[in-house]
Amino acid sequence: MISASGCCFLALDTGRIMLQQRSKTSSHPLTWSFWGGKSEKKERPIETLLRECNEEMGILPDIEKVYPLHTFLSDDKKFTYNTFCITVFEEFIPVCNSESSGYAWVGIHAWPKPLHRGARAVLEQPDMVEKIITIYNRQKDKLDLPNWLDSF
């Protein structure tokens, strides 16, 4: 089975999410997607996620918490994709490698276009968006931060 992991970053200071724009030479070129990639042998999903993010953006920011968000299993059961939401205290600027053409911090429901089909399948599901909002609200309450989502 082929396995992969990816994530969006959720900034607790703004309530915005960071997505990656895939490079012109990648599969699904110039679509907006999650950071991540394929697992190496015997790698757990979280290990894949952290390795891939480190490769794609040079250095990881201080991570507040990692939340499982969604798991996709193909109909033929030969491919699985684990999506996570990583909370960070504040927005940061990634140092993108050649797999990315750029990045964007965006508000909930203000997704850039075109979305990669996998990202679209997660971000356009109301229950997944609600889960992201719940993650944000729980974390910002713990840290006594203002609720930026009220402005979206």
Predicted stretch roles:
Residues 1-18, 38, 85:
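Conserved N-terminal beta-strand and adjoining loop/helix that marks the start
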Residues 12-14, 25, 76-77:
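Short strand-connecting beta-turns/loops that link adjacent beta-strands
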Residues 15, 31, 79-81:
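Conserved catalytic motifs of the protein kinase core domain
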Residues 22:
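Short loop/turn segments immediately following the C-termini of beta-strands
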Residues 26-30:
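A conserved beta-turn-beta hairpin within the catalytic core of GNAT-like acetyltransferases
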Residues 31-37:
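Conserved acetyl-CoA binding element of GNAT-fold acetyltransferases
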Residues 37-125, 150-151:
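Unchanged
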Residues 120-152:
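Charged phosphate-binding loop/patch that engages nucleotide di/tri-phosphates or the phosphate backbone
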